[in-house]
């Protein structure tokens, strides 16, 4: 039996993005899904980054090279799921994934993107799908006045 998202811990969220939704650019991602993936990558990459820095400071080229190679492999491996979850996070606030390119505007773009990533998503269905926090949402069809479950 698969866990409900309400029971997920950091590792469950990270695995959801890294493996089950590796290149899924459609739909919506909750803040928890995005930020736990970012935190998981940070925890995974930091030891190798430190290894590279220690290697340089001790003039140990082999150690530095090893740290840099592993760091690069991990960073490249998680580039696509990182981009995909960022696009889905933007979808959660009803913005197109193309808004991710705002990060190319020095300083201001990164700040705006960071604010958007911290913003709570739309509470109901938007242009990109149902609210990932409330999958039991009920939608009202004004043309046929009856309540239908999604």
Where are the regions a protein language model picked out?
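Hydrophobic alpha-helical transmembrane segments in multi-pass membrane proteins
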Residues: 32-89, 93-118
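Membrane-interface extramembranous regions at the lipid-water interface
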Residues: 1-40, 82-98, 116-150
